[in-house]
Amino acid sequence: MIGSTVGVEGAPREDHVRSGEAAGSEARFSAYVEGLSTALGHRDREGPFRAYCTGLLGTEGRKSVEPLAAATAPSRVSGQHQSLLHFVGQSEWSDAAVLAAVRAYVLPAIERGGPIEAWIIDDTTFPKQGRHSVGVARQYCGQLGKRANCQAAVTLSLANHHASLPVGYRLYLPKEWAEDEPRRKQAGVPDNVVFETKAAIALGLLEQALAQGLPRGVVLTDAGYGSDTAFREAVTALGLPYTKTR
């Protein structure tokens, strides 16, 4: 019997094919990370950035700094932990610049599958324990399908029938957080971050996308946004068509 790793005469062995695919994926990943790292401002941030991205893709379960450090540098977990913690929590780099670099890299590939058809406004939630993570509160958690302790972010993605790309996101800061000065200070919330409704955040993301000249599509929202008359009127005033899902 011919084993699975022995190919037809003249054809590549399956293990060789897999090895080549893995090498190609690693090369594309390296090129992608290197391209994005130019948006970080300093060359010395490329190493922690690469480790952070590698950990996010290769680590199961919790995506906090501790397991990422253990997965990406098992022989020097403590040092890697400090490096990643500094990169994530203290390094001053622009998320807007990184998002722009992502768009420049990914959007042309998506548009090869067809023109952008939709701008999708959605909530993304992250279940959390405790009360010290920024914005964590008891609220509806989509991941769990019920009210629970979680963080929530408003996101904007461009999409066609081929793929989608997140182009904007903003953490929702509940009023109880926005008005709690000691809690804000302890968590490092910037002074210019104030309470905004999710609808107001979504409108800000739409205005930002228009200012960036991104290819337009129909604004898609769930009923939580679509039932807000002021939100619908504001979207119309921006010159954007919209529809809502149930």
Can you say where each PLM-predicted feature lies in the sequence?
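Conserved, well-structured functional cores that handle cations and Mg-NTP chemistry
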Residues: 3, 9-220, 224-246
